[in-house]
């Protein structure tokens, strides 16, 4: 066992403060070892017709419990997996990253791309039989923008005229460019040409809820649940949520009538529970995937799917020492991040070449990842006033998730050996960690992000734009913002790519974050379970699941 793998032998003044870690992420994968929530059988997933029902009418799936069933409130992947089953968006994304109609049967783009009109399917109803109208869509999206309690993912609508000003409290609701022009038409005015807006509205955050939800919270409760998706909540407790097929679902009644979502893996762990036949589908860690791939019994049940996700480390750029670009550059260049990534030792995990994962439109061909260069790192550290690490202040790296601190240990080792810097490490539960990121970001932190929609801006502007809710390091750069604006407003493909490349170059130079790896998802699926095909958001729709005949 190498020194980096055995944290008990660290010859450094390293203090590991252990707090219970749980699987988490935003549109996120689980940490470190790239344990992937994105492969849970999710919603709005692979886009294909409903499959014929077989003799089996239920399935049991393991995954994190939802922190909220409200699309406008949820922001983590575990919640999105469940919410997407219960509430439908106007569009969906298939496994080839193509936008497909969902509640909207079609849409038109006019005024040079600045106006988008969505046409709802005729006869749409919620699960209780009440009519689903364009006004419900408008209400759902305005809830996301509410200035008193905006969604953590409200920035998805920033391209809409007046949307950002309204959620920031600096503009009136009446100025927001979202309106129902009839019971079936939703008209949206964009600040600039926005060819990606139909893809953006596929996000679970922008799913449609009944207009009376705020005054009738019972709509989110088991037994009285009212939704627009393929399933409704019929029972709920601390360890299991039961979903029942919505017989009024626009695409037809799902083939599997009952889905049991369990959030407690049992005393034996999820792999043993799956092997015992107690689970039909479960995500697994990359560590488990490496041995299961060679197991004669479990191997045939293993699923590996690319996931548009990135793991990155970031800094609080508003406070010393990381408000100094020289310090950030020293951390980026002073660590051999490829060695850190190699510790994950899992198929499908590769070093990042920038913030935009491979396979996402406008990923680009350039390499915008960190470059290991000790001479540069030492020079930058000296320029910041810390030659050889002398006088560097106390810093605690804080993360959350399910690994054992192996990656953090490697980072701490290299900072000590390469730059003479000693830092401490603490792991927190996801709720505490998320709250801290939003209110008082740690000096040095880690995040894994999975796309809300398949677009470069979901990994750039939404994560690093000035004032964005998910810009946890509070970084601000006018040139970066300008490049993003250019990318989003241009109708010329080459100009769009050039602008996104410029934005990535700025991130590489200024190092507000350090992209380290792109990940893949791993899961075990029972024999005969069909349709568990993730889309490019890492989600699979329960409505597309079925058991093969004879299962």
What is each of the regions a protein language model found here?
Residues 234-244, 260-319, 342:
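Extracellular/periplasmic solute-recognition and catalytic clefts
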Residues 23, 382-451:
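Ligand/substrate-recognition segments at binding pockets and active sites
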Residues 16-21, 341, 422-438, 461-527, ...:
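Extracytoplasmic/peripheral linker and loop segments enriched in polar/acidic and small residues
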Residues 119, 136, 145, 149-210:
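Surface-exposed binding/hinge segments that line
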Residues 173, 190-254, 258, 268:
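Gly/Pro-rich hinge or "lid" segments in bacterial periplasmic/extracellular proteins
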